[in-house]
Regions:
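Short beta-strand elements that form the blades of beta-propeller/WD-repeat-like
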Residues: 1, 14-26, 31-32, 52, ...
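A structural detector for beta-sheet-dominated domains
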Residues: 34, 46, 55, 63-64, ...
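Repeated scaffold domains used in trafficking and secretory/extracellular systems
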Residues: 7-19, 47-56, 92-100, 139-152
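Short acidic/polar, Gly/Pro-enriched loop/turn segments located at secondary-structure boundaries
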Residues: 8-11, 26, 34-40, 47-48
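A short beta-strand motif characteristic of beta-propeller blades
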Residues: 2-6, 37-44, 82-88, 131-138
Length: 166
């Protein structure tokens, strides 16, 4: 046993990379970045956390509630400096799945919204160098799992099929 962590969070969740993980409070505003043996960073955000993703290189993506947009996705460097943020519109949706490419240069984001009273799921790829999201798909099925097959290919597993995007 390397460590034992007592978060005290009401709705704890975890996202892991190769050498660190983030433990966060869903619907709360606190997160902790941990290595195998110690706390690296603790952060209290202004808004409630929806979802986090950790890359293999320690880059952290945090999707939060926002007063100015539907959701705010903030990407932090391994030293917890803000690298970029994306204020997601009502048309783009609220993130429900996120996954970093193995090289940590891009982030796949599945988001949900409603259009004409119907559920709509949107899939985006966000380049961390440019910060501009590119929409890969839009449909009525929400990905149950999202990941990268390589640095250029995203796999989305839906309820009744799996789709590869290049």
């Amino acid at each position: 046993r390397l460590a034992s962590i007592q978060s005290g969070y009401a709705r704890p969740a975890l996202a892991a990379g190769k050498t660190r993980f983030v433990l966060y409070n869903r619907s709360g505003n606190e997160l902790r970045v941990e290595s195998r043996t110690q706390n690296l960073y603790s952060k209290t955000l202004e808004n409630s956390i929806y979802l986090c993703a950790m890359s293999d290189t320690g880059t952290l993506a945090v999707a939060t509630d926002s007063a100015d947009s539907t959701a705010r996705l903030t990407v932090y460097t391994p030293t917890m400096s803000e690298q970029l943020h994306w204020d997601m519109t009502g048309t783009q949706g609220t993130p429900v799945r996120m996954a970093f490419a193995a090289d940590s240069r891009r982030l796949a984001v599945a988001a949900v919204t409603s259009s004409a009273g119907q559920l709509q799921a949107n899939l985006f790829v966000l380049s961390l160098a440019q910060g501009d999201p590119v929409q890969l798909s839009s449909g009525d099925s929400v990905p149950q799992w999202l990941g990268w097959l390589n640095n250029d290919t995203v796999l989305a597993v839906y309820e009744n099929c799996a789709v590869v995007y290049g």
